[in-house]
Amino acid sequence: MANKMEKMASIDAQLRQLAPAKVSEDDKLIEYDALLLDRFLDILQDLHGEDLKDSVQEVYELSAEYERKHDPKKLEELGKLITGLDAGDSIVVAKSFSHMLNLANLAEEVQIAHRRRNKLKKGDFRDESNATTESDIEETLKKLVFNMKKSPQEVFDALKNQTVDLVLTAHPTQSVRRSLLQKHARVRNCLSQLYAKDITPDDKQELDESLQREIQAAFRTDEIKRTPPTPQDEMRAGMSYFHETIWKGVPKFLRRVDTALKNIGINERVPYNAPLIQFSSWMGGDRDGNPRVTPEVTRDVCLLARMMAANLYYSQIEDLMFELSMWRCNDELRDRAEELHRNSKKDEVAKHYIEFWKKVPLNEPYRVILGHVRDKLYRTRERSRYLLAHGYSDIPEEDTFTNFDEFLEPLELCYRSLCFCGDRAIADGSLLDFLRQVSTFGLSLVRLDIRQESDRHTDVMDAITKHLEIGSYQEWSEEKRQEWLLSELVGKRPLFGPDLPTTDEIRDVLDTFHVIAELPSDNFGAYIISMATAPSDVLAVELLQRECKIKNPLRVVPLFEKLADLEAAPAALARLFSIDWYRNRIDGKQEVMIGYSDSGKDAGRFSAAWQLYKAQEELINVAQKFSVKLTMFHGRGGTVGRGGGPTHLAILSQPPDTIHGSLRVTVQGEVIEQSFGEEHLCFRTLQRFTAATLEHGMRPPSSPKPEWRALMDQMAIIATEEYRSIVFKEPRFVEYFRLATPEMEYGRMNIGSRPAKRRPSGGIETLRAIPWIFPWTQTRFHLPVWLGFGSAFKQVIEKDVKNLHMLQDMYNQWPFFRVTIDLVEMVFAKGDPGIAALNDRLLVSQNLWPFGEQLRNKYEETKKLLLQVATHKEVLEGDPYLKQRLRLRDSYITTLNVFQAYTLKRIRDPKSSVNASRLPLSRESPEATKPADELVTLNPTSEYAPGLEDTLILTMKGIAAGMQNTG
């Protein structure tokens, strides 16, 4: 009996022993987490019976014991327990741990919001322990004025002239389904409200019921996407964030900026047309290596975004009509209202409107003006809807809004008139919010970037030159290509007609340009050329835009990704700027994109980070020499291996003079949810980007000392050499990578619309950056992040012990170096070589075991050296909050790691011996109709033994949720 009682000790109690103590007075994380877990375990018992719930607890306890002492025997015990489950139970247990991790993440988010609110209530911004990830706009303005002695006017001028353009991308998109994200949002809301101070007992009871309902609904939802998403699906998923948080979040944030300005003595608001925040998208425009993004997809995505924008404005315009009921107005507005009133039909009624459906009387002039705007918005939306659904529309284009100024003008007229009549307070209400939305989102909601590989343009040019019988463009030297392209750009003759012989690929490139020509130009942002290496890459796109009759050509942005391309980028840019035709074309403005993912895959994180830093400095020097304003577009991934990390720090650690109030950065699919998933997250994201961009411009970080640069150069050579000697030159590496990680099985997740490889055959170099990072994240070994650091530190310290002191100075005084080290330290805090060792024992052939051991030794050595450089005794000693959060998650993740390793073994070796005691534990409650076995039938086409594929995918999703950075 005592034994049974012991076994029933809940995870909740276990958690309380395991978890670190409270980090601060307002720390409610353990409380939140325990409540969610208790509720979930009760639900699990109701749905699947006590035995299965006990099994989940037993698994958790073994995992928690492993976390205490890291004894590999505990992992084997865990493995035995897991392999003793039958197929249905296996899915339920894996699903339970994946679900518990998602709940732990939600508890964290609510705790972060709770701490933030408390901090704001106290007006306390001194708590620097979380300044590593925070940047408050009010705090930044005060710091600039009171500490840096900048004048309030200087700060205001800098702020209203700066632009942050956030570019939402689809790859690899969420590894959590949207159906679940919505349920998670409701769990978050219930949890926040449950802990509100003034809650009544009845409210508490109802909220608790709602909480349980949402937890159960999420658990009962199939976590696995059964079909891969199309680019249109990805676009709709991305657009849902505008609908839910970004649309209302932008004016709310800009109001907070106004308030912060007031508090430093500026009695002006940020002008509504100041482009503080802009949004762009790659969803449906990024065709680099994704054959599913066709010209038709691009057209659909633009029409969809236009329809959504018109719909969002339309849904608000009646509220504005209610608000602006005044009769006083200036002469300009009265004349316009009279003209519109005169031209409208005498007894016109619009039965499809709910409010103001009859003709508006002239003594409500603002409503007359806004009524006309509403009519046009309605037709704009309907025209886009018909074009999208049927390919044609009976609504003439001239009856709709086709350009931004035409939409803005009547709204500005209302604003001016209200101010003229002494009603500025009214003008600065909903109308100002609406104007700010129009200035931010325009008629297209987001601007779509087009991205294509440079080789595809070369193929088109080659077809043209062969058709003209002047040779093969592909075989020409760079000089000859430039000479020919420029002669054509200066000339007027058309290059080709409909008789140009084309392949499917060439037609696809040309049709994309035709779609750009056909649609309004405000739909599009930049044309990005990936794998750009030379000036001809840019000139070729300029020529194709002209040939395809694009009236307002897109700005052309070269993307430099590989290490060699980054090194050659400044020279390529200087050559471009020295061409008179090109300088006239760009009108003093150029954008360059730098890629973090591929440079990291090519040379390792250390060398990539340093090369990206130097390349930016050199590119800025080139631009200054030619008096060109350069905007850097940062293609950062969501994970550290792909250039991710806390926004505020990442921006503040950029080289001086490289941002200058103009920043473009990708917000990767896998982090969109944690950036914009909820109102307070959206607010925090906009605040961090705006504040950090302002601070970088007004208080640039100091340049590194010459001796620091010299040391970095030495270390980068060593780090690249070690990284490449293992990843590209070690003959055992590819086999080891494929066996020790779920790389081969990654494609089953149906995460994104892009194939995992650029070319179907080939080694590591053909893998996209995501399937390269994702498998290492799954095994918690994170090799692409740390490989190279250890040998670089070791060699320079062995060479001269003074170098250790220099590295410590660099860490304390140079933001770039500190951020680079801190991010790797954070990855070490999430890593566990014990899991990699288990994978080796189960999945890797014995002759590769010494190689795995060698890599794990490098991991430990690198970690030790990193802590020496940072002068830390243990990882994350400077960030108790993050440390606590990671410790809470570890036991769940470890369970999923072990589950994954044993499942992979059974998938790859169907004859592998497993426990025979496979009686189903799961018992459905009397009310339930489907036993756990039915979960196996959700995947009838699996080529593996029942339940294995789903269990594997659930572990992948769970680990991704736990690591909070997918790939």
Swiss-Prot record:
PROSITE patterns the UniProt entry points to: PEPCASE_1 (PS00781), PEPCASE_2 (PS00393)
Phosphoserine modification, residue list: 10
SUPFAM superfamilies for the chain: Phosphoenolpyruvate/pyruvate domain (SSF51621)
Keywords: Allosteric enzyme, Carbon dioxide fixation, Cytoplasm, Lyase, Magnesium, Phosphoprotein, Photosynthesis
Catalytic activity: oxaloacetate + phosphate = phosphoenolpyruvate + hydrogencarbonate
Molecular-function GO terms, alphabetical: phosphoenolpyruvate carboxylase activity
Localization per record: Cytoplasm
Cofactor(s), by name: Mg(2+)
Location of the region described as Disordered in the Swiss-Prot/TrEMBL record: 915-936
Assembly description: Homotetramer.
Family statement drawn from the similarity comment of this UniProt entry: Belongs to the PEPCase type 1 family.
Protein's job: Through the carboxylation of phosphoenolpyruvate (PEP) it forms oxaloacetate, a four-carbon dicarboxylic acid source for the tricarboxylic acid cycle.
Protein known as: Phosphoenolpyruvate carboxylase
Organism of origin: Pisum sativum
